[in-house]
Amino acid sequence: MFIGYQGIDVLPVQRAIHALRTTVYPSLQPQPATWKANNLPSSQEATGRRRIAFVSTWFRNHSVGKLLLGVIEHLDRTKFHIEIYRCVHFLQLPDELTDAFRRVADTYTELPVDMDDALALLRREYIDVLIYPELGMDEWTLSLAHHRIAPVQCVFWGHPITTGNPVVDYFISSEYFVSDFFDSDDNPRDDKNDSADKKDSADTFIHHGTHFSEQVVLFRGLGTFFTQVPGSVI
């Protein structure tokens, strides 16, 4: 996890690590998954809401949890059905922040420790968008991310570098977190030409950086809401 703090382009290294992991563990080779438009869950057919799933170990009193809770609270529930899947392979007991995540989610599930069982559970849910708040802090979640579970798969800013993973489609972060890394002589950002580097909305823009295997989408702002847990240390 410390490779991101060396001041180098880590994409070749991350791709090599990803390839090595799939060589050592053939079960991590991604298996094809299909989604049929006429086979959606009844809840989505009734509400029209997208099923957005967050998968992480860190739905707890941890920096990732503190920065993510408010984000989930502020998502528009008329558009999104929010599902939280907590990985419990080495931190099984919940804490007060875990309970807060349980309250703000439409559904809360603790994933089986067995990887095959966890994959089967997730694929039964017909998730539209799968979001990993971070990838890089524990091997189990990294391994899970080798598999295609949803049509769209994203990673947030919790670990600030590319995954090098071909089945992670988008890296979602803040212009304040990664834009300086893109703004070099060989990859300039032209703020005068809005169509060349940005599109979508007033809140986000797409950045065509070369240091990420994912499509990079940056918030015009921090893209986080900090939650201070009573009695905890920031």
Where are these regions (language model features)?
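Alpha-helical solenoid repeat scaffolds of the TPR/TPR-like class and their adjacent stem/linker regions
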Residues: 1-186, 200-234
